[in-house]
Design a protein with these regions (language model features):
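A short, N-terminal "cap"/entry segment at the start of jelly-roll beta-barrel domains
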Residues: 1-52, 91
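Short solvent-exposed loop/turn micro-motifs enriched in small/polar/acidic residues
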Residues: 33-35, 61-63, 92, 100-102
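Conserved short histidine dyad/triad with adjacent acidic residue
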Residues: 44-64, 103
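Short, surface-exposed beta-strand-loop junctions and turns on beta-sheet-rich folds
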Residues: 68, 84-86, 116
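Short acidic-glycine-tyrosine-enriched beta hairpin
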Residues: 83-103
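A short hydrophobic beta-strand segment most commonly corresponding to one strand
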Residues: 100, 113-123
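Short, exposed beta-strand-loop hairpins at the edges of beta-sheets
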Residues: 106-111
Length: 123
């Protein structure tokens, strides 16, 4: 996969219009619906990966990496789960929100339509 904003170039792209190829989320990570997701890699900054991630139509689980993200469009309900799978707390994010995720956090994302975010994450 090529980077949309490789190092050494002064360039800009539209975060809303950038092509993100979507594929089905694995059955093991799907809780409800028929979610699809994808990533468009933008590049790397100081060893951290930067990209656009999109999720559509469903509920999925994930184990997070250290990450900071900005929601470009859409929104999600993110439930933070204990080791036993009980909801510890919930965060709602919408376009314009900035959020930090801590490595190892277990989450459940519910997306009615879509969420598209720009992320900076440990590689």
């Amino acid at each position: 996969m090529s980077e949309l904003l490789p190092a050494g170039n002064n360039a800009a792209i539209s975060g809303h219009a950038a092509a993100v190829e979507l594929a089905a989320v694995s059955a093991a990570d799907t809780v409800a619906g028929t979610p699809v997701q994808g990533i468009a890699e933008l590049g790397e900054i100081a060893g951290a990966g930067v990209g656009i991630w999109e999720l559509r139509g469903g509920t999925v689980t994930d184990t997070e990496v250290e990450e900071l993200f900005v929601v470009l469009s859409g929104g999600a309900t993110i439930e933070f789960l204990t080791e036993s799978g009980v909801v510890d707390h919930t965060v709602e994010v919408v376009a314009g929100d900035v959020m930090r995720l801590t490595a190892g956090s277990r989450t459940r994302w519910t997306v009615a339509d879509h969420i598209r975010k720009v992320y900076i994450a440990e590689a």
